[in-house]
Design a protein with these regions (language model features):
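Short, well-structured N-terminal submotif of metal-dependent ribonuclease cores
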Residues: 1-37, 51-66, 108, 117-121
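Alpha-helix capping/helix-boundary segments
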Residues: 9, 41-42, 82, 101, ...
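Generic structural signal for small/hydrophobic residues in well-ordered secondary structure
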Residues: 7-8, 45, 86, 105
Length: 128
């Protein structure tokens, strides 16, 4: 299975947070699955850190890169087809990062790993 972790899921995986469900944790750790982290999540983390809403033990760039590698996640660029698909989505979610992740999941045939119930309203596969 090809999975796309949202920002919250990535942070919880990196911190071994107990809020992460067993289903999500198992799917993300399974060697049978390819798990992606979007550049959108890296950008969201950097913005939240700069605004003082997300304390990190190191720079956002170093944190995201080192945790992504440690968790064996593949990087996923936010490309032109995903950007074009984003504007076709109904305005069901106010967070532009989450809308971008939905677009990426649809365009790339990925399942989104997220606790965000609002994402389930979109025509994307969700795992939690």
């Amino acid at each position: 299975m090809k999975l796309l972790v949202d920002t919250c899921t990535f942070l919880w995986l990196a911190a071994a947070d107990p809020q992460l469900t067993d289903t999500a944790r198992s799917a993300c750790r399974s060697p049978e699955n390819t798990v992606y982290l979007s550049a959108l999540s890296a950008w969201e983390i950097a913005i939240k850190h700069r605004l003082g809403r997300l304390p990190l033990p190191e720079t956002p760039a170093r944190y995201v890169s080192s945790r992504r590698e440690w968790l064996r996640l593949e990087p996923l660029a936010f490309d032109e087809p995903s950007a074009a698909h984003d504007v076709l989505l109904p305005p069901l979610h106010s967070d532009p990062f989450d809308r971008g992740l939905v677009a990426q999941a649809i365009v790339n045939g990925l399942t989104i790993v997220t606790p965000d119930e609002a994402i389930s309203a979109y025509p994307a596969r969700v795992l939690w």
